[in-house]
Amino acid sequence: MHARITRFLLGGLLAFALLWAATGPGTAIAQEGEYGVYLKLVENAPGGFDQVVTTLREGAEAAGWTVVADYEVGVPDKNCSYRAHGIAVVSDEYVDQVLSHGPRAAFALPLRLGVFEDEAGVHVAAFNPLSLNRTIISETEFAEGSASAVAALQEIVAPFEEFQVESQYGQMRDEGLIKKTMGLIAGGAFDGKIEEAASVDVDEYGGLLATAEQLYSGLEDAAGDYDWKMRPMYLLDLSDQGVVMIGMTSGAMEAKAFDIVKEGTDEAREDFACPGLAYAAAFPLELVLVEEDGEVRVLLIDAMFRMKMFFEDAGKMKFAANMKMPPSLEGEMRDKIEDSLY
């Protein structure tokens, strides 16, 4: 995706309702408070799954956002006849807000929404910027940007009108810092969880964007290789601000993650066939390419830490039982990145 867009809408009640609840009357907007990792935006939408996806896509475009990823999400094979669909969006103004905190803040992009089915109907959710941006960008300094992102999500789902809801789920957090599980597993400041997967001289392929295009092409060619079959989903060209992003995903990875998390801490969903589809907005994973010190660096988030960011409510025992999954995902991505660039 090489297009840039010009319109950004700031409005809607949810962002300010959440911030008001966190800060109280007479208080300036702050990012303090307890927030869930996910926002449920639409509940029991009418018209069937495909129509909901179409309406969501059209809602994003009408609200002035560009769709950069639009794909069917992998679901568990066992006893799951339901579907999930991912849509990722960006706007020029929100990109500018995020990248004003530096190129590595790009891990907060793009905004991701998921359409998912369960026994109760078809729903729409998104990852919650009020929660995740505290982890990725700043504990306190991006409150207004996060509020504007939530307001934009409400604008995007405005076509669903009376089916809109304002609820949070996933791990409830009162701070951005994600601590170690059992004192050992994947915790700490976000900056320390950004890893370099590869670096090449900036002139090797002709600059930042050309390097990203070379990488994307190589990842496409290798999409069917290795166990997880990780594949690229989008290329987001922000090279005028020193960043290019590539989204990576895998149907097998998505299905496995949803099967592990299941209902999380929501006991009301524990009897559903595949409750983990509610977490569809967790993917794709992000590769961030930046130009630093004459090199193009390919950055990713430590895979175990990223799983904790989006699936921590699966619980300690499930993380302990599936310790091999994140390293195997990251290992495959690293191998494919190296094969594409070296």
Question: Predicted segments — roles?
Answer:
Residues 24-30:
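Sec/Tat signal peptide C-region and signal peptidase I cleavage site
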Residues 30-79, 138, 158-245:
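Terminal, regulation- and interaction-focused segments at domain boundaries
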Residues 32-34, 46, 294, 333-341:
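Intrinsically disordered, low-complexity acidic regions enriched in Pro/Ser/Thr
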Residues 11-22:
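Bacterial N-terminal signal peptides
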Residues 49-53, 57-104, 108-109, 129-132, ...:
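Ser/Thr-rich, low-complexity intrinsically disordered terminal regions
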Residues 2-13:
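Bacterial N-terminal signal peptides that target proteins for export
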Residues 103-140, 145:
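Acidic/His-rich structured neighborhood in mature extracellular/periplasmic domains
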Residues 130-172, 313-342:
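C-terminal partner/receptor-binding element of secreted or periplasmic proteins
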